[in-house]
């Protein structure tokens, strides 16, 4: 501890060394810029390079400084020095004077005020009825208390004292006093005051700037120099711009020119002389010690409430660098009541935007910006302060939008940028209506009085529906309630690791359930994903349409059945109304008696000898039923007669096909060509007669199937293909109960005739198939169509055709049916084919690559 005290320094020594080092470096920097002896360590290492040797796209003397010598080298030197000073500034700006040798936190005995007692800068015009203030400042946690802060006020900290995050300074600490930065015409440099040397450091006035603000102001003025300023200073065309800029900084009674002159003499000290032997520069009269600064802060915090109630004087012009188009008449266009916000010196927020009445004339000449989300408007001052101070954003603040950098780079005025954003983002409905007031209004009918009178005795506040709409809790929760709710949510999310603490009631309930015999159900096994279907979208749409068609047919059948029941009930009702009540003896009118046991409740009936006469309705019903039966019988007889006629024609055609006709034949004198013409005439008549709507009926009749098979044997290959195609189309209208008989009667002849076709004729037959109709009938489990297609596959194998290529050419997908009906009838119908050929056919199907080939091959093997 003694060693620490030995090398320790007092607060006054450290503050003096820090101030002397920064000011000396600035004076040395200015001396090096305007003198010829530039330090070689800071010079550019590339001495041979000259920027005038580079090629430019334009030859603009005004832009590139034509006619000047060594301007490029001076610019490079300035940039190098600016970067060096910029790095030094930010390295020393955050120095904390909390050396462990100090045993007292401050040099004053008075207790510093609490963080919550320090006033926060006000927004708007300072009026309680201001629209901007009531809409945004009252509801934004960034303009009032914040749950993210670490202050020691009445509100608690949700993060706790042991969270491990360093304390974050409030948002007001990231802001700068822009009124003190901007050069003002009203600010005058005080003349030099000759004072006697004193051993004590004089106190600084309350209007003096701190060391950090002073250095930052000097840095801003340094980097704001342009190339033309250096030109004037080199050539001597105008007054010293640097001296004028330093005079605008209000450095007390110290003259900037005298500092520049004293800089070389001050820096010329012996190399071996220690730093403490150097004489410290005299502080100006306006300097302020740390004790006086703390007392000033305490006084301002105690009198802030009184100062807010008083009318503030008219502030100076807030636009230090107005954009083009501003006139001098606009300088005093602000509201008289608007003044600089009360707060800590050096930590002020950007000045509040002007009211809508005073801002209209100025904003008419500024470009209209895109509107900003109203929830982000309270963050604009924080963003601007972070950009100007080059500081990090507080915790929980969103990142800075890029357009703020562009606006500040263009206008060079944070207050103007803030006013433009507010003017562009406030909705028109939130702006005050009615006449515009140019000055303060006093009286019961003034806008302020109306805002105060708007609150009724029973209403909680003066906020409007627009204010509640911007509130995330719709105005139903206070700040304390929100803070408490968020804290509970954070605690719940964090968890303690103990189930009894995190979810006590559920743990107790689960224990009671287990005690009662409850056991956890095993998790259901995950269903295996279904294999990807090879069905195309066209097939899928066709299947859906077919399903819808079947549902429509079923619906029609249900409607038809309901209609029959309704008609039947109507006939029964009509008959019951006219028919008298009869006894059981009516049923046995022609019998000798009723065969029933006699009892007291049912004595033996006497025979009723009256003639039984049917009613007119019953007679009509009987007649209608008989007529229906007669009509059906008549149609059946007509069909049989037509079949008999077709059989006669087929017998004649078969007789004409014979090579040797008998002597009794009526066609014995005809030539072969004439016989062929007669055969074609008769077969065409049969095909035109039966290959229409009556074909499904013909397929369900044994005589009809006989006519079809005999016709296939007589006609030529072209007509055979027509008949086969017609049979496959009409099979969808045949009852499924008849599929077995149809396959056994027709399929053998179909196989025989298809096998005898020429490969070109077979190709024509396959190309003429209606694949959509075939797929639809296969989905309906039409066994006849399935067996016919399987027969075509068998014939194609016999013709040495590749099934896969043949399936691709015909665009046919699969022979698998949903019902997977066996191939027993197909094997019986093809009894002429041996089992060896069927087995070979099954192997060809299995390794053909056709869709569902393995399932079809398995069915073929099962048919053996």
Curated annotation (Swiss-Prot):
It is found in: Cytoplasm, P-body. Keywords: Cytoplasm, RNA-binding. Residues 427-460, 518-539, 551-602 are annotated as: Disordered. Residues 427-439 have a biased composition (Polar residues). Residues 551-580 have a biased composition (Basic and acidic residues). One of its GO terms (molecular function) is RNA binding. Its main location: cytoplasm. InterPro entries: Pat1-like. It comes from the Eukaryota. RNA-binding protein involved in deadenylation-dependent decapping of mRNAs, leading to the degradation of mRNAs. Acts as a scaffold protein that connects deadenylation and decapping machinery. Required for the recruitment of P-body components such as cgh-1 in somatic blastomeres. May play a role in recruiting the decapping enzyme dcap-1 to cytoplasmic puncta in the cell body of the posterior touch receptor neuron, PLM. This is Protein PAT1 homolog 1. It comes from Caenorhabditis briggsae. The gene is patr-1.
């Amino acid at each position: 501890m003694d060693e620490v005290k030995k090398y320790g320094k007092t607060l006054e020594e450290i503050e003096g060394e820090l101030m002397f080092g920064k000011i000396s470096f600035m004076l040395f920097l200015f001396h090096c810029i305007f003198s010829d002896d530039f330090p070689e360590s800071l010079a550019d290492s590339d001495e041979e390079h000259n920027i005038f040797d580079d090629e430019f796209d334009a030859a603009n003397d005004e832009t590139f400084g034509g006619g000047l010598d060594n301007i490029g080298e001076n610019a490079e030197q300035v940039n190098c020095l600016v970067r060096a000073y910029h790095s030094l500034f930010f390295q020393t700006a955050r120095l904390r004077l909390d050396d462990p040798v100090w045993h007292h936190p401050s040099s004053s005995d008075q207790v510093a005020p609490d963080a919550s007692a320090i006033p926060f800068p006000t927004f708007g015009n300072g009026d309680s009825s201001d629209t901007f203030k009531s809409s945004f400042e009252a509801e934004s946690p960034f303009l009032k208390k914040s749950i993210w802060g670490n202050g020691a006020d009445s509100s608690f900290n949700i993060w706790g004292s042991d969270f491990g995050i360093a304390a974050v300074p409030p948002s007001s600490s990231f802001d700068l006093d822009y009124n003190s930065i901007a050069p003002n015409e009203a600010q005058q440099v005080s003349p030099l005051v000759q004072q006697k040397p004193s051993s004590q450091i004089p106190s600084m006035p309350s209007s003096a700037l701190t060391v950090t603000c002073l250095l930052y102001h000097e840095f801003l003025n340094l980097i704001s120099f342009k190339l033309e300023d250096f030109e004037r200073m080199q050539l001597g065309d105008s007054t010293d711009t640097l001296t004028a800029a330093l005079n605008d900084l209000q450095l007390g009674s110290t003259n900037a020119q005298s500092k520049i002159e004293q800089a070389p003499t001050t820096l010329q000290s012996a190399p071996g002389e220690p730093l403490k032997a150097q004489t410290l520069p005299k502080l100006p009269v306006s300097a302020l010690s740390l004790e006086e600064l703390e007392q000033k802060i305490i006084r301002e915090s105690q009198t802030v409430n009184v100062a807010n109630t008083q009318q503030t004087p008219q502030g100076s012009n807030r636009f230090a660098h107005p954009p083009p188009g501003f006139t001098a008449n606009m300088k005093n266009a602000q509201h008289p009541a608007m003044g600089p916000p009360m707060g800590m010196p050096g930590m002020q927020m950007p000045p509040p935007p002007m009211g809508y009445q005073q801002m209209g004339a100025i904003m008419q000449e500024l470009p209209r910006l895109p509107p900003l989300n109203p929830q982000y408007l309270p963050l604009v001052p924080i963003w601007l302060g972070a950009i100007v101070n080059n500081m990090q954003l507080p915790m929980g603040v969103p990142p800075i939008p890029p357009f703020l950098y562009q606006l500040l780079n263009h206008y060079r005025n944070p207050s103007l940028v803030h006013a433009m954003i507010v003017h562009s983002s406030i909705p028109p409905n939130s702006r005050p209506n009615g006449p515009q007031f140019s000055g303060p209004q006093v009286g019961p009918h003034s806008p302020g009085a109306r805002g105060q009178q708007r609150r009724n005795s029973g209403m909680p506040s003066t906020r409007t529906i627009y204010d509640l709409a911007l509130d995330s809790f719709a105005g139903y929760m206070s700040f304390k309630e929100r803070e408490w709710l968020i804290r509970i949510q954070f605690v719940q999310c964090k968890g303690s690791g103990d189930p009894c603490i995190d979810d006590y009631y559920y743990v107790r309930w689960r224990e009671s359930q287990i005690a009662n015999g409850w056991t956890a159900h095993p998790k259901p096994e995950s269903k295996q994903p279904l294999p990807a279907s090879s069905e195309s979208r066209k097939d899928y749409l066709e299947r859906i349409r077919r399903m819808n068609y079947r549902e429509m047919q079923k619906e029609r059948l249900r409607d038809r059945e309901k209609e029959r029941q309704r008609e039947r009930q109507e006939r029964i009702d009509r008959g019951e109304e006219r028919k008298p009540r009869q006894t059981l003896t009516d049923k046995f009118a022609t019998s000798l008696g009723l065969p029933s046991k006699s009892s007291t409740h049912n004595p033996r009936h006497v025979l009723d000898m009256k003639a039984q006469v049917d009613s007119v309705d019953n007679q009509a019903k009987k007649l209608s039923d008989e007529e229906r039966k007669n009509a059906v019988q008549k149609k059946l007889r007509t069909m049989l007669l037509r079949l008999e006629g077709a059989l006669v024609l087929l017998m004649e055609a078969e007789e004409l096909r014979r090579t040797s006709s008998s002597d009794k034949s009526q066609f014995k004198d005809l030539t072969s060509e004439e016989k062929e013409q007669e055969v074609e005439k008769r077969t065409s008549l049969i095909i035109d007669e039966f290959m229409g709507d009556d074909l499904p009926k013909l397929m369900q009749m044994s005589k009809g199937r006989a006519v079809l098979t005999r016709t296939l044997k007589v006609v030529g290959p072209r007509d055979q293909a027509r008949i086969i195609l017609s049979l496959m189309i009409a099979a969808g209208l045949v009852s499924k109960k008849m599929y077995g008989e149809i396959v056994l009667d027709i399929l053998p002849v179909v196989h025989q005739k298809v096998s005898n076709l020429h490969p070109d004729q077979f190709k024509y037959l396959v190309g003429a198939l209606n694949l959509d109709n075939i797929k639809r009938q296969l989905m309906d489990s039409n066994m006849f169509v399935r067996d016919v297609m399987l027969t075509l596959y068998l014939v194609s194998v016999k013709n040495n055709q590749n099934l896969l290529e043949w399936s691709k050419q015909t665009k046919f997908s699969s022979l698998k049916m949903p019902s997977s009906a066996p191939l027993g009838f197909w094997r019986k119908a093809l009894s002429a084919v041996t089992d060896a050929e069927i087995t070979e056919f099954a192997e060809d199907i299995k390794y053909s690559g056709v869709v569902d080939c393995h399932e079809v091959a398995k069915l073929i093997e099962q048919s053996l």
